[in-house]
């Protein structure tokens, strides 16, 4: 996937500053892009993501999730949506439906391919220690997928990183706290563009 994203940026001239931001699996893709850099990158934002590889004990759970998604996609979307949402999101009918609609739209085949890619993602912890860029690592205090310690460790490993913990947020920060996230991102983008 990282190669595909690099190819999509081929027409972006070297005079343009490049900042990468990745949410969840997108963070893994951004890290893989930095592991095989094709041009200079000035900034990185990791949102609900980490540099850790998938844990071996997660493999059986992921295989069950893959089977469930392949067998009954609508039911899988309901189950995974309930798991990922905080109680606040579940209690808001419009927000709950928006999240479920986006999950449904991803489709079973794409979601299964993403789960398989997540299972085999490389350990990027040593790579990020050598990054010389302005980084922002954002974690949700109630994220059921990404341990706070993993996200904090990524921020501590990157020399010029800032860690932001969003209280009450789960894994779905872009849906659950979009305004707060937008403010963080704007601040990071402005700072990065002004410093590089």
Each PLM stretch: what is its role?
Residues 1-21, 27, 32-37, 183, ...:
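Active-site loop/oxyanion-hole signature of alpha/beta-hydrolase fold enzymes
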Residues 20-22, 47, 138:
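Short beta-strand immediately N-terminal to the catalytic nucleophile in serine-hydrolase-like folds
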Residues 31-78, 82-84:
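Flexible "cap/lid" loop of the alpha/beta hydrolase fold
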Residues 54-60, 72-130:
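Conserved alpha/beta-hydrolase catalytic His-Asp/Glu region
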Residues 131, 137-139, 143:
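Short beta-strand/loop motif that positions the catalytic acidic residue
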Residues 144-150:
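Conserved alpha/beta-hydrolase "acid-adjacent" motif
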Residues 152-161:
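Active-site-adjacent alpha-helix of alpha/beta-hydrolase-fold enzymes
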Residues 161-196:
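Catalytic active-site module of serine/aspartate enzymes centered on a nucleophile-bearing elbow/loop
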């Amino acid at each position: 996937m990282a190669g595909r994203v690099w190819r999509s940026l081929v027409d972006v001239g070297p005079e343009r500053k490049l900042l990468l931001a990745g949410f969840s699996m997108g963070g893994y893709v951004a890290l893989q892009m930095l592991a095989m850099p094709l041009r200079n990158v000035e900034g990185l934002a990791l949102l609900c993501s980490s540099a850790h590889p998938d844990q071996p004990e997660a493999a059986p759970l992921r295989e069950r999730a893959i089977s469930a998604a392949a067998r009954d996609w609508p039911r899988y979307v309901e189950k995974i949506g309930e798991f990922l949402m905080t109680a606040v999101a579940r209690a808001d009918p419009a927000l709950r439906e928006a999240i479920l609609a986006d999950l449904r739209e991803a489709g079973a085949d794409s979601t299964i391919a993403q789960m398989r890619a997540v299972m085999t993602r490389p350990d990027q912890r040593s790579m990020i220690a050598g990054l010389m860029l302005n980084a922002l690592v954002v974690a949700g205090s109630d994220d059921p997928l990404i341990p706070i310690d993993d996200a904090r460790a990524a921020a501590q490993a990157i020399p010029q990183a800032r860690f932001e913990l969003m209280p009450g947020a789960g894994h779905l920060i872009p849906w659950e706290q979009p305004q707060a996230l937008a403010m963080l991102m704007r601040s990071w983008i402005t700072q990065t563009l002004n410093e590089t």
